[in-house]
Amino acid sequence: YFVEDDYIHELDAFTEMLFTYERIASLIGDELILCPTDYPYLYVQTENTNVYLGEKYHWRKINETLCTFLTSKQVIEKHWNKFLSMCTFEHYPFESPLHEIYKQELCISPIPSIAIHCTNINSIYGLSPNKNWKKIWDENKV
């Protein structure tokens, strides 16, 4: 699991991701990539998608993420040079090597989100909709 330091997860997010990974990998007979965030910016364009049933959430096929995602060792090894290029070359956007991987591998995100990217609310990424993020923030207090 690759996670950036500005994400807050629902308490059961990891359970949801692991059960969903197992379920959908079995369904498609292949490895995949899960992003825990339903980014609002991905709804700017209309495009066809596929919807999958996870443990407790529906998940939809997406073609872009930031740098927080869950995948398998097999996917990392298969696309190692693309992952490595993120550290050795300047890409714009930074995540473009990931987007290239998603042309070959299934990448999905939950509807609604199970994690929030704590970015500026006015940024292109925005806050994932249909969640009480204040409640989730409070539940994550240490």
Residue ranges of predicted features:
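Conserved catalytic core of nucleotide-sugar-dependent glycosyltransferases
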Residues: 1, 8-82
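C-terminal catalytic/acceptor-binding lobe
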Residues: 73-74, 78-142
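A broadly tuned preference for mixed-charge, low-complexity surface segments
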Residues: 4, 54-61, 118-128
